[in-house]
Amino acid sequence: MSARPQADFDGKAFAARLSTAPGVYRMYAADDSLLYVGKAGALRKRVGSYFNGTPKNARLTSMLSQVARMDVTVTRSEAEALLLENQLIKSLSPRYNVSLRDDKSYPYVLLTREDWPRIALHRGPRAVNGRYFGPYAGVTAVRETLNLMHKLFKLRSCEDSVFRNRSRPCLQYQIGRCSAPCVDLVAAQDYQEAVRRATMFLEGKSDQLGEEIMHSMQQASEALEFERAARLRDLLSSLRSMQNRQYVDGRAADLDVLACATQSSQACVLLLSFRDGRNLGTRSFFPKTNGEDSAEEILAAFVSQYYAEHAPPREILLDRAIPDAELIEAALSAAAEHKVALKWNVRGERAGYLLLASRNAQLTLVTELTSQSAQHARSEALREMLGLAEQVKRVECFDISHTMGEATVASCVVFDASGPVRGQYRRFNISGITPGDDYAAMRQAIERRFRRAVEENGVLPDVLLIDGGAGQLAQAQAALADLGIENVLLVGVAKGEERRAGHEALILADGRELRPGAASPALQFIQQVRDEAHRFAITGHRGRRQKARMTSKLEDIPGIGPRRRASLLKHFGGLVGLKAAGEAEIARVEGVNAALAARIYANLHGLALPDAAGESSP
């Protein structure tokens, strides 16, 4: 997720649009130089803390005064955010992070390079000759890995000074966690083989290692070496019970992960990159589209164009299949002079990467659509299209939602030049109309909203959008006329051909019809507002419908009146809790005896109802 450069960056507004998920945030100056990278357990809270109140010190004041934009990357956990933060700091060297982080904060697994290698936890500078695996999110993760290494491969952990002076095996040998190379109880060749296998495991090559051990086990069985075969069998069993990899290794293969999100005729392609096994974070791209391109087509074009200028890794994960995949794959392979594989049907860790990229693409696109600079541009385009003399400061949109006339709800959403003003959204439960009469529902909602504005001298919108055609627009016109409101510009948003986005017709109160086209920033703004009104109406309708259906289930039971119904729902926290209860538990509710409890249970579970004679309905 990102915010584009602005003259005066509004950190509070940016933070308010973030999710509460864990992740990493990055602050950039106006010249696009990276100022700071940090991690957060809850992005909205952490980022917002920078812009609430006075900065705590001069360094923070200086840094925040230079912020022109921010990016965030959502992660699956705070531990993953910590790893990504460390990797970004190392690879990008942000100006204000230099004195805040060093390797002492992050533990590694060290496998030394010597005649009898040892495996151990390591912090600090990499002064010891060996392979370093990590960084890990914490000491606990390293210790779990070391415990596994000792159990599976029986590698030593003692310091060299201890190793050189032992005359008999230590306790680690006695409990089966070391092969005692210190007193020559294991051949050098066998120990080096154990080191090789441990390295394969730490590199994430568990599948290859498992196949190798399986082959060795079969060979041992054929040679009637049953004891060795049993040891290999146990090793294979333990290996398969572990996760394939628990860290990011410095020598893992390069990988790019691409996800595409589309909304309101706009698209975002998010690139998540790994180089030398390190997560380098995300980059967001907003390709120009004609409003009719599918996400698959947009992603295919991006892959072709982006990797024409950037060296592709050997593996590129895509969140969907793309047209001409084989052709693109062949072209990239030829240009790169190495095999480039495009993949989308993946499992395990790679599926997690795709999910992460897809989630970030959606969040980034939503942020882009609601970012202040983009909203100002679209708002200005709307003003020009409608021929208004002044800036559009407030837009409202109404939509109706119901299921075959049931539980009709109208929504009213509010946007200003900076985006949605969610605190002023309103829903109206529609009643007293013929079920399914959208015209009457729209008129009732408009009357209720604007009558209150007239009575209380409330704020009126500059533009009022009505999701519907000429009929819905006429109802809104009549409602405003009855209330004496004349200075609100009405616009009906009629669905386009085959209900395709970008083909909407805008109907004005004087009968004129505008078709600005998918590429129009003004229409994109209208689409965004209309889609938000639609979402808000559907959410309200579903909640009202569910509540009505829950209540009606109890109303159908003889002996259940309003008082008992309220007691039951309050006691169990709703119908779901009531359905999960047994007859005895239901009978504990005040005013419910055993016979009534049996009837309630039977009704909720579709069983034959007991006789209801003799029950009243309080």
Swiss-Prot record:
Q: Which SMART domains match?
A: GIYc, HhH1
Q: Name one GO molecular function term.
A: DNA binding
Report the InterPro entries cross-referenced here: GIY-YIG_endonuc, GIY-YIG_endonuc_sf, GIY-YIG_UvrC_Cho, Hlx-hairpin-Hlx_DNA-bd_motif, RuvA_2-like, UVR_dom, UVR_dom_sf, UvrABC_protein_C
Does this UniProt record's set of keywords contain ATP-binding? no
Give all residue intervals belonging to the GIY-YIG domain: 20-98
Task: Please state every residue range assigned to the domain named UVR.
Answer: 207-242
Q: Which example biological process does GO assign this protein?
A: SOS response
Instruction: Specify whether ATP-binding is a keyword of the entry.
Output: no
S-S bonds = none
Which Pfam families does the entry mention?
GIY-YIG, HHH_5, UVR, UvrC_RNaseH, UvrC_RNaseH_dom
Q: Which GO terms describe its cellular component?
A: cytoplasm; excinuclease repair complex
Q: Where in the cell is it found?
A: Cytoplasm
The record's annotation in CDD domains points to: GIY-YIG_UvrC_Cho
Q: What is its main location?
A: cytoplasm
Q: Which family does it belong to?
A: Belongs to the UvrC family.
The task this protein performs is described as:
The UvrABC repair system catalyzes the recognition and processing of DNA lesions. UvrC both incises the 5' and 3' sides of the lesion. The N-terminal half is responsible for the 3' incision and the C-terminal half is responsible for the 5' incision.
The entry describes its oligomerization and partners as:
Interacts with UvrB in an incision complex.
Q: What is this protein called?
A: UvrABC system protein C
